Structure formats: structure tokens, C-alpha cells
Amino acid sequence: MSRFLGSIFKKSRRYGISLLENNKEFTKGKKRTTAPGQHGARRVKPSDYQLHLYEKQKVRYMYGLNERQFKHLYSIASKKQGVTGVILLQMIESRLDNLVFRAGFARTRAQARQFVNHGHFTVDGHKANIPSMVIKVGSVIEMKPSLQTSPQVKDAVEAMTVSPWLTKTDFKVTFNRLPERKEFAKDINEALIVEYYNRR
């Protein structure tokens, strides 16, 4: 786990944002503006391609998606009516692991993913153990009793807030609506992601 966190801390510094969305990566001191590594202080203007790639990677790392998963969601989003970048973010936000995180059942998306993998949740009364599962609006996600007394869950419930597009009652949460663009992280520029894939 420590190696994973170390990697996330370095990536957060590289991209200049908290990928964990809690600023934990920067609590030990002043937030650095340089990239990690011996030559991190060298300011080199990134190329146009690098800007687009960095934006894609930033969102990937923030939500914990691998390249295949991210590309698959983009492919679906690009075929839908509407603004492709916003639809992509809405689909990512609709993943089961992310909704467990947004509901405040876990401190991080990695922890939420672990809970889902271990079969601790149901969706509309049915077993759900696939973190990447895209949940439909109106669905109800419920935590099984086996996890409800966990100290990790208690810690998360006390520390985290529930996103406004969800309604939570005890260990049950309803996915009421898709989040609006203004509710996503302000540091995300989804237009660069769309341009990245359009150029490939």
C-alpha cells in the first residue's frame, strides 16, 4: 500500500493537483510547484501533445482507471448526443467504485474499489463486485452488514461528505442524477482529452 501511495503523491506533485481529492499529498509541507525528480525544477514548456496527454493521464490517475478502461469509456461517450468531454466525466463518475467513494463509504477510490471487489455491496438488491460497473441513475447501492461495523467504514463516514447528486440513508445510497459540469473538479479540462483522442 505504501508504494501505491508514494506513486500517487509523486503524480499529484507532477500534475499539480490532489489526485486523492483531499490534499493529503500536500499536508506535510508547502505544496511544490515543480515535478518530482532530480531535474524537476527545470521549467520546460510542454509541447501541445504533452498538454493533451497530461490532461488525460491526470483524470485517469484521479479516478484509478487503466488505459483500456479509459479508452473504452471515451469510445462510448463519443457516440452519444451531447458534449463528449462532459459525458465522459459523467460516465466515469457513474462507476460503482466512484459512487461508493462519493457516498462517503470509503476514504479513497482505491479503498472503495477494494470494498467492491470483496463483494460488500449490492445494486438494486443484486450482488455487485465489479468496480468498473457503470450504474444507472435511480439505482440504489447498499452496503452489506458484514462491512458496516468496520473501523475503516466508520472512519470514512465521519470524515467524508456525500456528493449532492446522491441521497444517503444509513448504509444505503440512491444515485439521483448525473453530476453537472460545474460539480466536477475545476482543475479538469476535458476539452484537451477530447482533442487528444481526436488527433489519434
Swiss-Prot record:
UniProt keyword list: Ribonucleoprotein, Ribosomal protein, RNA-binding, rRNA-binding
Residue ranges of every copy of the S4 RNA-binding domain listed in the record: 94-157
GO cellular component annotations of the record: small ribosomal subunit
SMART domains for the chain: Ribosomal_S4, S4
Signal peptide stretch: none
InterPro entries: Ribosomal_uS4 (IPR022801), Ribosomal_uS4_bac-type (IPR005709), Ribosomal_uS4_CS (IPR018079), Ribosomal_uS4_N (IPR001912), S4_RNA-bd (IPR002942), S4_RNA-bd_sf (IPR036986)
GO biological process: ribosomal small subunit biogenesis; translation
Job description of the protein: One of the primary rRNA binding proteins, it binds directly to 16S rRNA where it nucleates assembly of the body of the 30S subunit.
Subunit structure: Part of the 30S ribosomal subunit. Contacts protein S5. The interaction surface between S4 and S5 is involved in control of translational fidelity.
Family note: Belongs to the universal ribosomal protein uS4 family.
Protein name, as recorded: Small ribosomal subunit protein uS4
